[in-house]
């Protein structure tokens, strides 16, 4: 499944390690984690899949996150991606969020299925060398004035 997603997500793909972590999270039994994997097959051949992670939250952040949906466009019947998303929505308890690149044609599909554009996501990534320098106990300290 990791390799299938890595190949068929095309230019929108994550690295294999990130895909594997999303799958591990989906299958986790730890509190506040979990999710599920949907597979679309044509005979014995995998032609599509979707990964949902549960967020453990609700309200301000949807309870579920559609992490990945991909199809093998050469082998999957037309509509396989839409069917996977519909099934993911039906199987999820609570609301579902996803991220999609601005130039991804799948935005139209998601809009047709009832998703609306709520936010523009912005990310700040801590430099790797800085992550390694900060001890865990320092990261857990309360902000100044709350001690």
Name each model-derived stretch.
Residues 2-61, 67-68:
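Acetyl-CoA-dependent GNAT
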Residues 82, 97, 102-124:
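Conserved active-site alpha-helix within GNAT-family acetyltransferase domains
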Residues 66-76:
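A short, internal acetyl-CoA/4′-phosphopantetheine-binding micro-motif in the GNAT/acyltransferase core
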Residues 75, 79-87:
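Conserved acetyl-CoA pyrophosphate-binding loop and the N-cap/start of the following alpha-helix
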